[in-house]
UniProtKB/Swiss-Prot annotation:
Its main location: secreted. InterPro entries: CRR_secretory_protein, GNK2, GNK2_sf. CDD domains: Gnk2-like. Pfam families: Stress-antifung. PROSITE patterns: GNK2. This is Putative cysteine-rich repeat secretory protein 32. Residues 1-28 form the signal peptide. It comes from Arabidopsis thaliana. Keywords: Repeat, Secreted, Signal. It is found in: Secreted. Belongs to the cysteine-rich repeat secretory protein family. Residues 35-136, 143-252 form the Gnk2-homologous domain. It comes from the Eukaryota.
Length: 255
């Protein structure tokens, strides 16, 4: 028979194991909304308190906050030079309250990090927000406001083979993102999936903002950028205001 002390030790072990599994499950799915990067567009200047630009900006912030956040948004208000243009988009697997929470975080973060700048961009794990005085046409890709991040660890094994297969998989996802929706209302602009690469399982996603015409072109450019920053890394991403790509060796996509 088990003694009460042995039984107690077993219960403690099960409890600790359960906590570890829960922590691993949460962290592996990347359910956080970490701050990633920001950029103040200093060339667009600053606005004064209670100016027409600030009124337009506050109107847009309040207007967008009333949506249900199922996809990205692009709105403008006022006439130049006091127009405020928004590009806001959540990650393809972040929607509803998660997206709304990220929007509130992004607005607060932008006000704090780029105080009174007319133009600014901020990226979080679940969304990004861009405010600008310039209303770019949908045919123009924004390759200037981009950045990359990568896992500090390198993969084990054949780096060249991994890089090639990883890029091929991202190109496959880019083709899927550029296909029409089932209801014919537009392109998907988002694709994610997994692929077995030897002993590793690759998790990846690609996404374009809903205001551009050439999604596939933008994604292909971002995939090529991975070669400049992140060869052989266990995970990496290239983010911008037109599109982004990401891959990891752990699950980070909501299903």
């Amino acid at each position: 028979m088990y003694s009460s002390y042995s039984l107690f030790k077993c219960l403690v072990c099960f409890y600790i194991l359960g906590i570890q599994v829960l922590i691993h499950s949460v962290s592996s799915q990347n359910l956080t909304n970490a701050y990633l990067h920001h950029k103040c567009l200093t060339r667009q200047g600053k606005y004064k308190p209670r100016s027409p630009y600030e009124e337009n900006l506050n109107y847009l912030i309040d207007h967008i906050s009333k949506y249900h956040f199922r996809d990205g948004f692009r709105h403008s208000a006022g006439e130049a030079p006091n127009s405020g243009n928004f590009v806001f988009q959540c990650r393809g697997d972040s929607y509803g309250s998660i997206c709304g929470s990220c929007y509130a975080t992004a607005v607060a973060g932008l006000r704090k990090r780029c105080q009174r700048y007319k133009g600014a961009i901020i990226w979080y794990d679940q969304c990004f927000l861009k405010v600008s005085t310039i209303n770019s046409p949908p045919t123009k890709m924004d390759y200037e406001n981009t950045f990359s991040m990568h896992n500090p660890n390198n993969i084990n094994g054949d780096t060249q083979l991994f890089n090639q297969k990883m890029k091929n998989f991202l190109y496959e996802l880019a083709l899927k993102a550029d296909k029409p929706k089932a209801d014919g209302t537009g392109l998907l602009y988002y694709a994610a999936g997994t692929k077995r690469l030897g002993k590793n399982k690759l998790y990846a996603m690609v996404q374009c903002t809903l205001d551009i015409f050439h999604c596939k072109v933008c994604l292909e450019w971002s995939i090529k950028e991975l070669s400049k920053c992140c060869e052989g890394k266990q995970g990496a991403r290239v983010l911008g205001t037109s599109c982004n790509v990401r891959y990891e060796l752990y699950p980070f996509i909501r299903t």
